[in-house]
A protein has these predicted regions:
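A domain-start/cap signature at the N-terminus of enzymes
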Residues: 18-92, 117, 232, 279-283, ...
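Serine-hydrolase catalytic machinery in alpha/beta-hydrolase-like enzymes
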Residues: 54-84, 90-163
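Alpha/beta-hydrolase fold nucleophile elbow
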Residues: 161-173
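Gly/Ala-rich beta-loop-alpha elbow adjacent to hydrolase catalytic centers
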Residues: 172-176, 180
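A conserved short beta-strand
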Residues: 189-201
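Short beta-strand/loop motif that positions the catalytic acidic residue
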Residues: 214-218
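C-terminal catalytic histidine-bearing segment of alpha/beta-hydrolase fold enzymes
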Residues: 224-292
């Protein structure tokens, strides 16, 4: 597993969120207040229980801390969101959110992403009328490819970085996964590694001809049959591909920060395997004399 310095922070944040959610955001009763309550008969207990409000429902998705994005003005384009790499380098991860999705979902895996490289999150090019501030994606793959390349150039110019626009790890979720599939179909040389989260339809093998590695993932509580079938199609065709199952989560959820970081770390390890071990050179054997 890649560097796990993020593990302590993610664990603490996840535990705090779970405790907070379990108590409905309220402070738990103290031991003194609990012990001071007077005993009552079973009949009174039953009446009190019947009239008491129901316990607060746990959230469907475990809340995550919004990423501490740097937001860059992209001129005529929508502002782009940037997270730096843990260690400066050329690797860049581009995130494409889902249909009218929350770009802050990246908060579920910030440290793991930072160990991969800098992260750039774009917003869809079409506004969602019923969800102000949310966006969806058109089917213009050429325009999206150009937006990604401009965003990388802008980040490089702003920070004097040297992110490689021809070696992008592309991460699309739900509708963003569809757009990622379209991008690698036409511009695979720029996107050699692709992560497809919760793709809503079966992947087409012919769209991945020049991709080096494909990771597909879905939640245990959603229908993953087509995701698994698509990954199996790719494997059968000889691609480096794998399906990852996120336990106990539904569509649109990464399971919180601890689970999200663990999952993305494993996925990125798969996409970028360690270099092969080079065996030390052996001494050449002495030449054999040929009988005269």
């Amino acid at each position: 597993m890649r560097g796990a310095g993020w593990l302590v922070t993610a664990s603490a944040l996840t535990l705090a969120a779970l405790v907070h959610a379990a108590h409905g955001g309220e402070k738990p009763p103290s031991a003194s207040s609990a012990s001071s309550a007077s005993p009552s008969s079973s009949g009174v207990d039953a009446i009190s229980a019947a009239g008491a409000p129901p316990p607060p429902a746990l959230p469907t998705h475990i809340p995550v801390t919004p990423p501490n994005y740097e937001v860059l003005d992209a001129g005529s384009d929508r502002p782009i969101r940037v997270l730096p790499a843990a260690t400066p380098g050329r690797r860049v991860l581009v995130y494409l959110h889902g249909y009218c999705g929350d770009v802050n979902a990246v908060g579920a895996f910030v440290p793991a992403a930072a160990h991969e490289g800098a992260l750039i999150a774009l917003l869809g090019d079409q506004p969602c009328k019923d969800k102000p501030g949310r966006f969806k994606w058109s089917t213009d793959s050429h325009a999206l490819d150009q937006r990604i390349q401009r965003a990388i150039r802008l980040v490089n110019h702003t920070h004097a970085w040297d992110l490689d626009g021809s070696d992008v790890t592309l991460f699309g979720y739900s509708q963003g996964a569809l757009r990622a599939e379209a991008l690698v179909r036409y511009y695979a040389k720029r996107y050699p590694r692709v992560i497809l989260g919760g793709p809503p339809r079966r992947l087409k093998v012919e769209h991945f001809k020049h991709v080096q590695a494909i990771a597909v993932f879905g939640g245990e509580l959603e229908d993953t049959s087509q995701m698994i079938a698509g990954a199996e199609d790719l494997i059968a065709a000889g691609f480096r591909a794998r399906f990852f199952l996120l336990p106990s989560v539904d569509h649109g959820d990464f399971g919180g920060e601890l689970a999200g970081n663990l999952a993305l770390s494993e996925i990125l390890d798969f996409l970028s395997p360690p270099p092969p071990v080079i065996e030390p050179a052996t001494e050449p054997a002495a030449p054999t004399k040929v009988a005269q």
